């Protein structure tokens, strides 16, 4: 996400960080918003080129913990023998422990809140000039196929996603797959549609696809999702996709 004056905001730090870092145009400031510290969301961080450039300030934001700071927790991965450098060796990096609440990045209002997923996990809502992007990549809005909440105020993530222009949301499981994985912290297709409809979002980008799903299976799934006739646009999250919010 590009903010004011080209300031870059990156949502999570998965394997795409290496390619992103190699193609980032000159920027003096990068902000990385981490939802949680599961490996698929942080494994690309040490390979992000701006992290090692003393002329670029990188602010890393992530969920607060009662036991260790964000930098201490990331240092368990960013240190030998898993990686040759330690967090303290990074040249111009600032870590922020994020509690539920609202803060500002270069005029963009960022709201963070805990969502339903194993371990401390944040969702993010970014607002600027009346436009809203909500990012909920790992999110189980209801437990069980028949327990979707009727009251929005009691639904995990609703406050972050309400009225979003772009909702980027977990879409890992088919309903059949989810029935055997209740409580794993990911969404079924039915819950995905119900949650998006509840929020009144304008565009839904499906995200966090199951790595065992082939491109053909994903294409077929998205045909079925669109065939339900939702009041919002459905866009499949793909590598290199560019959207205007």
Name each model feature, range by range.
Residues 1-137, 142-145, 157-158, 218-245:
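Binuclear metal-dependent hydrolase catalytic cores
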Residues 140-235:
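Cap/insert and terminal regions of metallo-dependent hydrolase folds
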